[in-house]
Amino acid sequence: MGALCSSETYMLDKEEYKKQVEHNKSIENDLEKDRKIKILKLLILGPGESGKSTTIKQIKIIHDEGYSAEEKMVRKHGIYMNILEGIEEIHLSVGRENKSYKNPLSFDHINEVRMFTENFKKADDSEKLLGPEVINAIQKYIKDETIAMMLRDKTVYNIDDSTIYFLENFSRIIQKDYLPTEEDILKSRVPTSGVIQYKIMLKNFNFRIFDVGGQRAQRRKWLHVFDDVQAVLFITSLSEYDQVLREDATVNRMKESLNLFEKICNGRYFLNTAMILFLNKIDLFKIKIKHTNITVALTSYKGPQECDSALDYIRKRFISLNKNKKRSIYEHVTCATDTEQIQVVIDSVIDVVIQHTMQKVGIQ
């Protein structure tokens, strides 16, 4: 009996040992999978001024703690600069469009703004305030009948939407106790130079979100560094089909965006990467399509000059550039400054990145 009991005990111990080994192996596998997905990397790409930085701001507002009073104070100086640069852009548009000022003093007002801008750039942050002279010059300048007309027809003259917004809110912004709202920050523009990294915890995963400068030289310099990202979020502006690049006035922005998307989508660095497409600035596109056909950039378009048909054509043009038919392109039509709408879209993007990563490491 003793020998029998000993044999049974041995068999039980052996089975338990095997189970324990398998259990330990399972834990090790889980830990290895956890290690592989410990940090999820999302790379945001697209041409300059397409809405990449705005999307990251939205993620910070929706999923993080937003902006502190100190951060808002820093952003205030950038908003002042946006206004000053916006006035200069309007002045340049007057010349490009062969328009004339109705008020002869408008030249004096623009010169006042220009001189102030040069000093503003050199000043310390503590001194970066809009003084009464430049405030008066801006207020009188935008009352010129030619300028007022151009501001009303902003999409015809391609005046930046943020410039319109800040001028509409100018009386609030020039108050001494002014502190930017979240909407002000979303509308503000700060060109991305190099790579901006943003760290955030989303749905119990550590995310690293990278915003690469949209200008050509910036992209060429950094793209090869990101061959291990889980997903690429490509953002293009729907409304800039009749505009040219800031860095090259011979290149149409929509054509540049299509060419860039094709290179990213089929490039060797991102063959196994989830690809997400934001067709951004739909709000401005709906306005512009009423007076300017997309044929100025996409000559093969034969459909009607209306939003739905033109949008569908642009969408199909982008999707057709994907040569990897096993990979789906997750597409969204967006307005990056609309927090309520973009919240739903960003949640979808986060889910795509997580699911794609888990599938790659064998969890699903």
UniProtKB/Swiss-Prot annotation:
The gene is gpa-8. A lipid is attached at G2 (N-myristoyl glycine). Residues 207-216 are annotated as: G3 motif. Residues 184-192 are annotated as: G2 motif. One of its GO terms (molecular function) is G protein-coupled receptor binding. A lipid is attached at C5 (S-palmitoyl cysteine). This is Guanine nucleotide-binding protein alpha-8 subunit. InterPro entries: Gprotein_alpha_su, GproteinA_insert, P-loop_NTPase. The keyword Manganese does not apply. Residues 276-283 are annotated as: G4 motif. One of its GO terms (cellular component) is cytoplasm. PROSITE patterns: G_ALPHA (PS51882). Pfam families: G-alpha (PF00503). GTP binds at residues 46-53, 186-192, 211-215, 280-283, 336. Gene3D superfamilies: GI Alpha 1, domain 2-like, P-loop containing nucleotide triphosphate hydrolases. G proteins are composed of 3 units; alpha, beta and gamma. The alpha chain contains the guanine nucleotide binding site. Residues 38-364 form the G-alpha domain. SMART domains: G_alpha (SM00275). Belongs to the G-alpha family. Residues 41-54 are annotated as: G1 motif. Guanine nucleotide-binding proteins (G proteins) are involved as modulators or transducers in various transmembrane signaling systems. GO terms for biological process: adenylate cyclase-modulating G protein-coupled receptor signaling pathway. Mg(2+) binds at S53, T192. Residues 334-339 are annotated as: G5 motif.
